[in-house]
């Protein structure tokens, strides 16, 4: 009669019948062995991941490679100058608005058409913060 071998417990059962296997698989020692097996397997997988990461990091460091996160990205502006805040470097910065107000293409109240753009000249010249009036323009009669 064939015997059943339990890999977790490293033992042969008396014989290969469903009732014997069911009794064995429900036992405390078998459950502990299964739990230890998978816990060890998870620890091994975690260690492999740590080793791979350390190896990849060391390889990049030794070759002097630039980290992939900086490739193709815009250069970082100098500290203290935030171009989104407007104004040249060294000028006091304006605080950002907490919520974007209605602007071109933003809908108004439900069922209302979108708000038109602000008055002419309120966008400001390039490089200047918004809401700064443009310098007066000369109009020629036609």
UniProtKB/Swiss-Prot annotation:
GO biological process annotation, one example: spliceosomal snRNP assembly
Taxonomic source organism: Caenorhabditis elegans
Gene name of the encoded protein: snrp-3
Keyword annotations from UniProtKB, A to Z: Metal-binding, Nucleus, Ribonucleoprotein, RNA-binding, Zinc, Zinc-finger
Function statement: Component of the spliceosomal U1 snRNP, which is essential for recognition of the pre-mRNA 5' splice-site and the subsequent assembly of the spliceosome. U1-C is directly involved in initial 5' splice-site recognition for both constitutive and regulated alternative splicing. The interaction with the 5' splice-site seems to precede base-pairing between the pre-mRNA and the U1 snRNA. Stimulates commitment or early (E) complex formation by stabilizing the base pairing of the 5' end of the U1 snRNA and the 5' splice-site region.
Molecular functions per Gene Ontology: mRNA binding; pre-mRNA 5'-splice site binding; U1 snRNA binding; zinc ion binding
Gene Ontology CC terms: commitment complex; U1 snRNP; U2-type prespliceosome
Subunit structure, as described in the record: U1 snRNP is composed of the 7 core Sm proteins B/B', D1, D2, D3, E, F and G that assemble in a heptameric protein ring on the Sm site of the small nuclear RNA to form the core snRNP, and at least 3 U1 snRNP-specific proteins U1-70K, U1-A and U1-C. U1-C interacts with U1 snRNA and the 5' splice-site region of the pre-mRNA.
Record localization: Nucleus
Protein name: U1 small nuclear ribonucleoprotein C
Family: Belongs to the U1 small nuclear ribonucleoprotein C family.
Pfam families with a match to the protein in the record: zf-U1 (PF06220)
UniProt-listed HAMAP family: U1_C
InterPro entries: Matrin/U1-C_Znf_C2H2, Matrin/U1-like-C_Znf_C2H2, U1-CZ_Znf_C2H2, U1_snRNP-C, Znf_C2H2_sf
Top-level taxonomic group: Eukaryota
Region forming the signal peptide: none
Zinc finger annotations (Matrin-type) as residue ranges: 4-36
